[in-house]
C-alpha cells in the first residue's frame, strides 16, 4: 500500500503538550456554579488546554455570552454552530454575580459571533462590562468580541463601556485566513483593532495568533508587523490543536524554544507584552497585561456612580 502523505498522517502530540489534569474542589465548584447560573465559558466550549490551571489554580474564567451557538463555522474552533438562541437580557447580571462569587480580579468576556443581530450583540456585550464593574469595581475586564462584520457603531458601543483590554484575534496569517476563518477578513480584523485604539487610545489592544496550520516563519513575522502597524499593544501566540477530526489538521507542532524565539522577536518589534508557548491561548495570564492606571480610574468612576445611586 502506498504511504500516506506526511500531512495526512496522524501526528502524535509531543511530550510538552501533555498536561496533568487538576480537578480539585475549586474546579468542580466553579463548574457547578456555571451550570446553575446557565452561563457558558469558552474554557469548556473551545476545549481550552489551560482550563484546569485557570479554574483550579488561578481561579479565573472566560465567560462566553450571547448564547453558546455561533453563526459562523470556523474550521479551527470547537464551539457549536447553527441557528442561535434568543438574547438573554438577564445574562449580564448573572455574569456579574458569578464574578463576585468567584472573587475574580480579572475576567475575560467573549462571545459567539452573532451575525444575525444588527449590532452583532454589542449592546448586551457593553451592558455585561458595565454590570461586572458595578458589582466588582476593581476587577479588570477584558473583552474578546467577533469583528461584528466591521460595524463601526457596534465597536463604538462596546468601547464606550470602557473595558480594560480590547482583544480581537487575528488567528492566523493572511494567506491562510480564507481557509481557517469563516466570513472573517484579515484586513477587517486589522481595521477593527486600529479603530478601537483610535476611539480610546488609553485602552490596550490585543490579538492572538495560532501556529501549526502551515504558515511560514516569514508570514508570522509579517503578521506581527501588520498588528504593530495598527498599534496593537499585546500579542499571544499558541499552538493550534485539532479539536475533532472534522477540524483542520495540525501541520506542525512548534517546540517551546521556537515559541521563546517568537516572543523575543515580538518584544523587539514593540509589543508591550507577549505570551508565547505551546499551551498559550488568548486569555492566558491576561491579568498581567492590564494598564493599571486606567484600571484605577475606571474603578473610582464606578464607585462614584454607586454612591450617587
Swiss-Prot record:
Q: Which residues form the Radical SAM core domain?
A: 56-272
Per its UniProt record, the required cofactor names are: [4Fe-4S] cluster
Catalytic activity reported = [[Fe-S] cluster scaffold protein carrying a second [4Fe-4S](2+) cluster] + N(6)-octanoyl-L-lysyl-[protein] + 2 oxidized [2Fe-2S]-[ferredoxin] + 2 S-adenosyl-L-methionine + 4 H(+) = [[Fe-S] cluster scaffold protein] + N(6)-[(R)-dihydrolipoyl]-L-lysyl-[protein] + 4 Fe(3+) + 2 hydrogen sulfide + 2 5'-deoxyadenosine + 2 L-methionine + 2 reduced [2Fe-2S]-[ferredoxin]
Sequence positions that bind [4Fe-4S] cluster 2: 70, 74, 77
Where does the protein end up? Cytoplasm
**Any Pfam family matching the protein:** Radical_SAM
Which pairs of positions does the record mark as disulfide bonds?
A: none
The record's remark on the cofactor is: Binds 2 [4Fe-4S] clusters per subunit. One cluster is coordinated with 3 cysteines and an exchangeable S-adenosyl-L-methionine.
Q: Which UniProt keywords apply?
A: 4Fe-4S, Cytoplasm, Iron, Iron-sulfur, Metal-binding, S-adenosyl-L-methionine, Transferase
Q: Where does [4Fe-4S] cluster 1 bind?
A: 43, 48, 54, 283
Gene Ontology terms, MF aspect: 4 iron, 4 sulfur cluster binding; lipoate synthase activity; metal ion binding
| GO cellular component assignments | cytoplasm
Asked if Ribonucleoprotein is a keyword of the record, the answer is no
Question: Per its UniProt record, what CDD domains does this chain match?
Answer: Radical_SAM (cd01335)
Query: Which segments cross the bilayer?
Result: none
Q: In which pathway does it act?
A: Protein modification; protein lipoylation via endogenous pathway; protein N(6)-(lipoyl)lysine from octanoyl-[acyl-carrier-protein]
Q: Where is the signal peptide?
A: none
EC assignment: the record states 2.8.1.8
Name of the protein in question: Lipoyl synthase
- The organism encoding this protein is Shouchella clausii (strain KSM-K16)
Q: What is the lineage of its organism?
A: Bacteria, Bacillati, Bacillota, Bacilli, Bacillales
